[in-house]
Structures are given as structure tokens and as C-alpha cells.
Amino acid sequence: MNKDYQIFWPSPSDPVRFEVDTSHEKVESISESDTMNVSNLSQGIMLSDSPICMETTSTTCDLPQNEIKNFERENEYESTLCEDAYGTLDNLLNDNNIENYSKNVLTQPVDTISISSLRQFDTVCKFHCVEAFDDEMTEKPEFQSQVYNYAKDNNIKQDSFREENPMETSVSASTDQLGNEYFRQPPPRSPPLIHCSGETLKFPEKSLAKSTAKESALNPSQPPSFVCKTAVPSKEIQNYGEIPEMSVSYAKEVTAEGVERPEIVSTWSSAGISWRSKASQENCEMPDMEQSAESLQPVQEDMALNEILKKLKHTNRKQEARIQELQCSNLYLEKRVKELQMKTTKQQVFIDVIDKLKENVEELIEEKYKIILEKNDTKKTLQNLQEILANTQKHLQESRNDKEMLQLQFKKIKANYVRLQERYMTEMQQKNKSVSQYLEMDKTLSKKEEEVKRLQQLRKEQEKVTASALDLLKREKETQEQEFLSLQEEFQKRDKANLEERQKLKSRLEKLLTQVKNLQFMSENERAKNIKLQQQINEVKNENKKLKQHVARSEEQNYVPKSETAQLKEQLEEVMKSDITKDTKMTHSNLLLDCSPCEEESLNPADIERSSQLASKMHSLLALMVGLLKCQDITNSDAEHFKESEKVSDIMLQRLKSLHLKKKNLDKELLKHKDRITTFRDLIAKEKAFQDHAIKVTDCDSDEAKSIRDVPTFLGAKLDKYHSLNEELDFLITKLGCLLESKESHCNRLIEENDKYQRHLGSLIKKVTSYEEIIECADQRLAISHSQIAHLEKRNKHLEDLIRKPREKARKPRSKSLENHPKSMTMMPAVFKENRNDLD
């Protein structure tokens, strides 16, 4: 409620206090204690012991008795006006308001009546305190601020009381609104507010101001506009039917003065102080009036007569106003009778309400004892439930622990299952790879088996060729024997001619012996050289071993490139070729030296065998190196190996064919030369036998000697060719054997790897089956754990239902009793609430 009040506080010279309401809104409602105390207030105003009467008597002691009587009449009139105002308030309340009031009393608690009575007593005390403070306020203006603060505190208390008792404030608000409307409506002939002069000041104004101050003290919640609207005219009362405009003009003048001297105070304190100041002004002005009257009596008798006439007119007007006031008082008395009747009805209603409240209290006491019994029962049930809860909590903790253990086991099994799945996937991938490798190995094995079959067929063909060659050699041998017989015949014929030549040859033999000695010396030197060559060969073997080790390391590291392997092959071939050429030269030289026709010792077969052995060893070393390099090539790339092996096999077959042809030719020539050599040896032996018996031979043909010397050189050259061809054949045969051995070893390796893979597959299959069994066991455990969890959840639900049932049983009777008597909820003990919270 926003209200703007302009309070004009007059100076000591101003006789009247005015208040103007600028809000044009509704006034705040008065409290219920003021409405219930209307009758007491009206009686308190009439008492002579009250501070109002004391003040009036004190102020009127210096005045004449007529004016005192008039003042008492006006005071009674104002008290009746106040009673009329409060009576109209009570009459304006309808029966509906009474019914609402009775209902509100029924719904209120028992202590509200005592509180309202205390509030009534408090308001009366405040009224007397206000009247007592008014004198002090006039004498000591320092108390004005204290009174203002007290009014604020009183307003705050009433607001808090209204918040605590909204039902009472609603009833009082309705009555206050009606009362405010009544006081705002001016009477049909409201006395105007007239400017006060020092001559014509009378005390009804003061009494009316006092009554308004009392009303404002009784109703501190009312604004100052309420006081202004119920104010009585300040000086001589004119005709009530006339409404002069002086009040409005005077109000404007006062507003102007009030703006210059604004002093805002609370309603009841400002009223008391203003009327005290007015009384002091009147006391000061009365002796002045008497002096002026005494001085002007002899001089202005005419003026006195006029004044008497005016006074008579004024008294007439007063009488008319008095008649109207009496009529109003009659109406007020009628209303008062009705009000008393309503009060009696209200008292009966209150008695009925009190009886009902007593019955309710008895019922509440009975219910209290019932609730105490129920409380004991519930305590017992709660103890049982607590025991059950303790057991259930133990079971729940055990079940939770089991559940956690099962969850941990499940997580472990799940992790193991995931790992097994990953291993299974990796093993399946390895299995697929091994299967693909196994299929590839099968293909390579099948190809190699086909190659082996081809080589076996070639071997059989070679054996057939060798058999046919041997047959041819036998035939040639027979032919040579026949030729030998023919040659023997010719030799016998020539023996005779040779006898002559022997003598010539003896002389030449001596020369030849010297040459043979020289040749022996040369052969010894060459043998020393051969020993050195053997040492070099041993060094080469060591180097070959080192190279083999280096090749093995390179195979492990797979770091040796193909270009280096090719260079190593070429270097080894060059070295071996150089060694072979040296060996062949040495053998040729040995053969040439040993095959001298002069001495049998020159033809040493041990040297020939050694040279052949050395050549065969060198060929075998070369074959081993080639085989190693080819094995390396096989390990590096199988496809290249197969291609190279096919090419090599084709080339070798062609070479074998050509070598077989050459071998046949050489075998034929060898047989011939062997026969010739045997013949020459026989001749040499015969010549040695006949040396003792020989005669000096002088005649020897130089042509025959030359032919004899040329035969060993020719035979040596052919033997060299034959040896070289045999070495090449042996080299090719060893090479083919190495290839076959490498292929067989490779096939064996593949078979072993295949067996390993099959074993690995078997172990993998076993592992997979074992993993599947483990997974099945884990699934079974999971199913068991799920079933256990479901069983535990069912048990928990069952236990929760058991816990809820006694709660619901305890709540049902309470809800019924609370529906009938909501006040019984306050009797619930705190212990039961704590137990209930524990259960929750």
C-alpha cells in the first residue's frame, strides 16, 4: 500500500493542526483486537479516571462554568459519535461474516483466544501509555523520536501477528474496510473547518481532537488521513447544512505554511502534541480576551448587543445541530441494541465452539494414548525388523562379496577369453599361411620328383650308352689283338734288321743315359715344385673352407648380393683353372720325362695317379663350390633355382652326349696307344735283356730313331686329352650328384617341415579344443552367477517387501487419525522419526 501523506505541523501561533491525504487509496485495515474491543473502548472514553478527562479538567479549571458544561456536553457528543462509528462497523458486518468468523474460530488452535485477549489488553495499555506520554511530549520534544520508534515497533509486531494468524487478519480486514468506508463518508451536515481566532476558541475542538487522538492510538495501523476525516470543527460551529469553502482555502494556506516548516511524525504522537500545543495557546489567549472585554464594555455597547445577537444565532444553530446529534444518537442506540444481540449470539457460538474443542481435546488425549501403545508396538516391530535387517544386510554383504568375486572371475575369464580369441585368430592365420606354404611345397616337391625321375631316366640312358661303348671297346680290343699278331710277325721279320741297328743304338744309349740323368735331376726339381703346389692347394682348400664359412654366414644374414656371388664364382673358377692348368702342365712334364724310351724308371705310375687325384680333388672342390652357390641361390629364390637347374640339366645332357662321343673316340685311341706302349715296353725289356749279349751296333738309321722319339710325345698328348675329358666327365657327374643330393636334402627338409607343420596343426587343434572347453566352462559359470544374482535380487525384493509391510501398517492408522485430527501429528516422538530415517 503506497500512500502519500502531507502532514502540516503548525507553529505555536497556529491554533489548528491539519492533515491532507494525497494517496486516494484504501486505508490499511485495523487489527482484530481493536474490532473486538469496541465496547470497552467506548466505555473507557466515558470514564472520568481516564487521562482524557484528567486533561480536560486540568485545562478547564480557569474557565467559567457555562463553558465547562458546554465542553462536557460536546465531549459526550463526541464520545457518542465514536460509539456510533464503531457501532456502524459492527452493524455493517453481515451474518456471513459471523459464520465465517465461527468457522475460523473452529479451525484455529486453542491458544488463539488467549492470544487475542492478551492483544486486547496490550492495545488498552498502549492507549493509556499514549495519553501519559502526550504531556511529556509537549514539555519535552526529545520524546517525540522515542514515541515514533515505539509506533514503528508496534506496527512491526502487529504485522508479525498477522503473519502468524492469517485467519484472524482476514476477518479483521473485512471489518476494517467497512469501518474505514464509514468514517470516510462525511455526515450529512459535516461541520466545516474554520480558521481559529484568539477570541472565539472553545474546547469541543480539543475534546474532538482528543477523541481522534485516542482512536489513532487504538488503531496505530491507520494512516493520518483517518484522523483528518473524523475531525470536528476547530472553533465556533456554524450551520451543518452549509459547507463553506473556507476549509479548502485554509487547507491550501496551511499546506503552504507546512511546506516551509515540515515536521513529519507518527499519527497518534502528532495528534497528541498538536492538541497540547493548542491547549497551551488557548490558556495564553484567555486572559487577553478578558482584558479586551473589560476595556471595550463602556465604549462599545452596541457592538456587545450585536455580539449577543450573533451568540443567540449561534446557540440556535447549536441547538439544531444538537437535535440532529440526538437523532444520530438514537440511531446509534438502535444499532447498539442490535450489536448486543449479535454479541450474545456470538457468545453462544463461542460456548459451542469451546465445548467442541473440549471434546476434541479429550479425543486427542485418547488418541495420544493409543499412539503411545502403537509406538511401543512399532518399537518392538522395529527391533525385530532391525534384527532382520542386520541378518539381511549380512546376507546381502555376503551376496555382494560373492557377486564381486564372480564379477572379478567373470572379468578374468572374459580377458582370458579375449586373449584366447586373439591367439586363436593369430594361430588360424598362421595355420592358413602354413597350409598355403604346405601347398606350395607340395607343388615344388612334385616338380622336383618329376625332375628326379627325368634324371633317373637319363642315368639309365647313360648306363646303356656306357655298356654299348664297352662292347665296342671289346670288339676293338679283339681287332687290335689280331693286328698285334700281325705286328709280331712283322717284328720277327724286323728283328734281323734291328740286330744290326742295336750296335748303333748302344752308342747312342750311352748318350741317352747322360740325358736321362739330366732329366731325372729335372724331374726331382719338378717334384719339389709339385710339393710346393700341393702346399698351395692346401692353402686354397683352407681358403675354400673360409669361403664356405663366409657363405654360410651370408646365408644366415641374407646379406650377400648376387653380384658378389657371381664375382666369387668367377674368381674361384679362375683360380681353379689356373691350378688345374699348372697341374696338367706338371703332369705333362712328368709324363714326358717318365715316358722316355731309354729308361723304365722314367715312367712312374705313382706320379700319374697323384696328378689324377689332385685334378679330381680340384674338380670336386669346384663342384662343391658350385653346389654351395646354387644351394644359396635355392635358399634365396626357389623359382630361379628351378629355372637354373633346368638350364643346367639341359646343358649337362648336351655336354654328356658330346663327352660320351669323345670318350668313345678317345677310348679307341687309348687302346691303340696302350697296345703300342706295351709293345714298346716289351721291346725295351728285350733290348735290356739282350744288352749283355749285344754286340756293338754301329749302323742305325736316323729316321727310325726319330720315329721312336716322337711316339711318347704323341702318346702323352693323347693321354692328356683323355685325362681332361675324363676329368670333365667326373666334374659333370659330381655336379649332377651334388644337385641330386641338394634336391634330396631339400625334399627331406620339406618333408620334415611338413611333418612339423602337421604336428603344429595337431597341437593347435588340441589347444583350440581345450580353449573351447574352457570357454564353455566359463559360460556355464556365468550362467550360474547370473542365476545366483537373480536369486539374490529376488531375495532382496522379498526382504524389502517385508520391511515395507509394517511401515504401511503403521502408516494406515496414523493417516486415518490425521484425517480426523490433524493436530495429532504434533504428538509423534522424535525417536520414531529417527528410527524411520534409519530404516529408509
UniProtKB/Swiss-Prot annotation:
Pfam family, one: CAGE1
Keyword check for Coiled coil: yes
InterPro entries reported for this sequence: CAGE1_homolog (IPR052686), CAGE1_N (IPR029381)
Cleaved signal peptide residues: none
Residue ranges the record marks as coiled coil: 303-559
Record keywords, A-Z: Coiled coil
Region (Disordered): 800-840
Compositionally biased tracts (Basic residues): 806-815
Keyword flag Cytoplasm: no
PANTHER family recorded: CANCER-ASSOCIATED GENE 1 PROTEIN
UniProt protein name: Cancer-associated gene 1 protein homolog
Originating species: Macaca fascicularis (Crab-eating macaque)
Protein encoded by which gene: CAGE1
